[in-house]
Amino acid sequence: MKEIKTKKGRRRRKKKNRQRYRIGSIAFGILFLSCALFLIISYGKQKQAEREYTSLRSEEPCVTVGQIAMRTGIAAVSAAEKEEIPHSDAPHLENTIDFSALQEKNADIYAWIQIPGTLVDYPVLQHPTDRLYYLNHTIDGTAGLPGSIYSEAIHPKDFSAPMTVLYGHNMRNDTMFGSLHDYEDPDKLTDAPYVYIYLPDKTLIYQIFAAVRFSDTYLPDYCDYEKESDFMTFVKVLCSSPGNINETVEVPYGSRLLMMSTCIGNAPNNRFLVGAVLIDEYEK
């Protein structure tokens, strides 16, 4: 009698184990399919955003990599202009951005950044209230990667502050600010030294002087950039950080800095900063 009960008990346990196994397999399958679906949707959104940015670049005929010496739209710098701005040998590129058309797509677009010699060639956005909105929203408002190139509302849109920070994701395919990591090669600072910021009424030219690993401190609160001692201390700390420095570029007090910030894949508590100083500006 005991043997019969024991056999029945074993059968019940086996049956329960099989049920648990089936339930576990079904749950795992649902989880796997959910993850796969999420990845597919995320990848689709990312590719759609990349197509949107590519479309914008094709609509806005900025000078692209490899065309600087050929494009007839490049304005030659005259001798008189060089006398007015003796420190700038950067070519004046034609500002052909149609900001009216861009702002019909998104009113938060206020500038365009281009770094000839890299893949950086994007609109710049600023949300009026949510400083992190464009970290995870594309220009059409879609949530998720690759986000946008953006600044925070603390920074004037005419880049008149002593220090302006632009943020962008470090994408694996080098889009957004991913190609800033090219400046880990010291030769890149001289091969691709200029940053162009196109505004509705003028163009700003910056020269890159630093590409370093920095802490993830919130740069706008790092110091009072209006004070000479604070400004020069920041420049000194920046140029003492691990990375590459172009020591031929002067960064005196009173300069206007552009800091481009992106993440470092294996260092979540650090940021890769590319620092540039304003060397020229001209009307559109």
Task: Label every model-predicted segment.
Residues 1-20:
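N-terminal Lys/Arg-rich, disordered targeting/topogenic segments
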Residues 22-33:
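Hydrophobic H-region at the start of alpha-helical membrane spans
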Residues 32-284:
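Solvent-exposed, non-transmembrane regions of membrane-associated and secreted proteins
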